[in-house]
Amino acid sequence: MTRDKEVWKAMTKFDYEILMLLNEKNVDNPLKAINISQILEEISVAKRKSYSTTYRHLQSMSKQGYVKCGLVDGLASTYYIDELGKAYCKAQN
């Protein structure tokens, strides 16, 4: 549990927005995974970042175990929330 809290402290507000979106939309397996453009469409304009910044955040969260890559959608990578990401969201509520 200590390790999780340390990782959670490194979470940014934008990471949190992405995780909460994936959790609320129940994007929790490779078949339901959504691409970066779809993620950005769902995030409010005031909180939205660029495509490349979003990609970097998703890559970081993937390395930490919060999200995983889903099935490829055309040429686009897709992402879904993993168990650690769900646990983080649950701990925030």
Label the model's feature ranges:
Residues 62-72:
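A short, conserved structural fragment
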Residues 14, 32-35, 54-57, 77, ...:
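Short, conserved alpha-helical segments within structured domains
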Residues 48-63, 76:
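Short amphipathic alpha-helical interaction segments
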Residues 72-93:
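Short, cationic-aromatic polyanion-contact patches
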Residues 29-43:
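Short acidic, hydrophobic short linear motifs in intrinsically disordered regions
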Residues 1-30:
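Short alpha-helical segments that sit at the start of domains
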